[in-house]
């Protein structure tokens, strides 16, 4: 049984339509010319898009070429366009076991939005950076867009 050119073209178009959803959001480094010690290979948002009735979780997968010890901070900044909305800071050791040996690393940031943040925008630019405070060294910095869906309750808007 031979597959026609039309069927191959249709299969290609369908795979192109669904492949971005399978790969997670497009992300980029904050400074495209810089080689960070922690190289990010993927970013996943769950659920994608984030539902206003729930919350979102970000999972970052990558590889570090150096040991990361205690005292490192993970910063998550939310912005609408280029206008900052909020900043959250986490100790790396609260997110993953420390010290982190060179090699693969997975970071998961749960509950990334406050109730107010879920109400006020249809999407956010998120900037996540990891900084070694004692050395003042940026170990990773990425940015990407997260979309929100669903309707915010008017009662919640009045009472919060």
Swiss-Prot record:
GO terms for biological process: intracellular sterol transport; positive gravitropism; response to salt stress. Involved in the regulation of gravitropic response and basipetal auxin transport in roots. Involved in salt stress tolerance. May facilitate membrane trafficking and asymmetric cell elongation via SYT1. Binds stigmasterol and dipalmitoyl phosphoethanolamine (DPPE) in vitro. Residues 1-23 form the signal peptide. It is found in: Cytoplasm. SMART domains: ML (SM00737). Its main location: cytoplasm. The gene is ROSY1. PANTHER family: MD-2-RELATED LIPID-RECOGNITION PROTEIN ROSY1, NIEMANN PICK TYPE C2 PROTEIN NPC2-RELATED. It comes from Arabidopsis thaliana (Mouse-ear cress). Induction: Induced by gravity stimulation. The keyword Signal applies. GO terms for molecular function: phosphatidylethanolamine binding; sterol binding. Expressed exclusively in roots, in epidermis and cortex cells of the root elongation zone, and lateral root cap cells at the root tip. This is MD-2-related lipid-recognition protein ROSY1.
């Amino acid at each position: 049984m031979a597959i026609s050119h039309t069927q191959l073209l249709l299969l290609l178009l369908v795979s192109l339509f669904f492949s971005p959803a399978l790969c997670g959001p497009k992300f980029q480094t904050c400074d495209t010319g810089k080689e960070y010690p922690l190289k990010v290979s993927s970013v996943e948002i769950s659920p994608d898009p984030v539902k206003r009735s729930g919350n979102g979780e970000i999972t970052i997968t990558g590889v570090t070429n150096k040991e990361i010890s205690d005292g490192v901070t993970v910063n998550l900044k939310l912005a609408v366009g280029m206008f900052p909305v909020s900043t959250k800071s986490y100790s790396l050791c609260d997110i993953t076991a420390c010290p982190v040996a060179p090699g693969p690393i997975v970071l998961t940031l749960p509950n990334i939005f406050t109730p107010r943040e879920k109400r006020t925008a249809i999407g956010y630019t998120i900037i996540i950076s990891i900084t070694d405070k004692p050395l003042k060294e940026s170990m990773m910095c990425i940015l990407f867009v997260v979309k929100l869906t669903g309707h915010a309750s008017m009662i919640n808007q009045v009472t919060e």
